[in-house]
Amino acid sequence: MVDLRIPAALKLGPKLKRSFFARSVHEVAPDLIGATLLVEGSGGVIVEVEAYHHTDPAAHSFGGQTPRNAVMFGPPGVAYVYRSYGIHWCLNVVCEEAGSASAVLIRALVPTDGLALMRRRRGVEDERALCSGPGKLAQALGVTIAHNGLKLDAPPFALHGRLAAPEIVAGPRIGISKAAELPWRYGLRGSKFVSKPFAE
């Protein structure tokens, strides 16, 4: 069955290698729109992300390395997981060379695989509510601190690139008080699965 929620060009592409992440966070972030993220078989197509650079006051790494953010200072292509407001886990991908401490927050995806399990984890039926926000996404995919520092090109993760470049929109990031004006949130144009619509 054709999934009309996702352009055909965004169907499962080649597996992303570490070199994909060893680039500027501002290149990696929009390039992740349309990629497919699976965690032990559950997941879907990424439709919203945010970039965080080490020179960015909103980045966890801005004040220097701590036990909590140490993974950000490591090699690219690994998961950086933290708890937001002491409640929700959030999944990020570390970018650029080791020591640069930049990452992309995965904010939303279109659920395509393992929907029954994701619904049980989230306690909701509406597929648009399963992964439309970083906390929801991590809960749906079963991501916890146990995934912190794990390589994204090896189980339990599977991350595949898109087959063609989609239409991408950009705007200010959400829920931050510092550098809130920077247009470092990226999304798939017209997607109903993002956490908040983009102003166009």
Curated annotation (Swiss-Prot):
CDD domains to which the protein is assigned, alphabetical:
AAG
Could you list this entry's UniProt keywords, alphabetically sorted.
DNA damage, DNA repair, Hydrolase
- For whether the record's keyword set contains Transmembrane, the answer is no
Q: Name one GO molecular function term.
A: alkylbase DNA N-glycosylase activity
| Disulfide-bond pairs as recorded | none
The cross-references to Gene3D superfamilies, in alphabetical order and at most eight, read: Methylpurine-DNA glycosylase (MPG)
Q: Which domain of life is it from?
A: Bacteria
Protein name according to UniProt: Putative 3-methyladenine DNA glycosylase
